[in-house]
Amino acid sequence: MNQYARTELLLGAEGMSRLHGARVALYGVGGVGGHAAEALVRSGVHQIDLYDNDTVSLTNLNRQLIATRSTIGMYKVDAMADRLRDIDPEVLVGAYRMFYMP
């Protein structure tokens, strides 16, 4: 059994394969983006690119998954990349310390 067995029951093998083959980019991994990144990887997305130039601060502790006393001062993309790899060691995470401005 693998960690995505329950998701595969819902999506089927073809759906799971499509999800596993998806590549997702998230711009901002704080409050909303952090929850989205974690949900995507827990669902089976295998490649994710994270863009954020901010660092974890004390004021993030009340609302952000990546914010703990041990991550204060870390770049948010690095803290999130560590967290996502802890959930699935095979996930491919691109962590980009930059703001995206269209």
Describe the function of each predicted region.
Residues 24, 65-68, 96:
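Conserved short-loop catalytic and cofactor-binding motifs
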Residues 96-102:
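Conserved SAM/SAH-binding loop
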Residues 92-94:
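Conserved beta-strand segments of alpha/beta enzyme cores
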Residues 1-25:
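N-terminal charged helix/coil linker that caps or initiates catalytic domains
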Residues 10-14, 37, 102:
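A generic local structural motif
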Residues 45-88:
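Glycine-rich phosphate-binding loop and adjoining beta1-alpha1-beta2 segment
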Residues 20-42, 47-52:
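Glycine-rich adenosine-cofactor-binding loop
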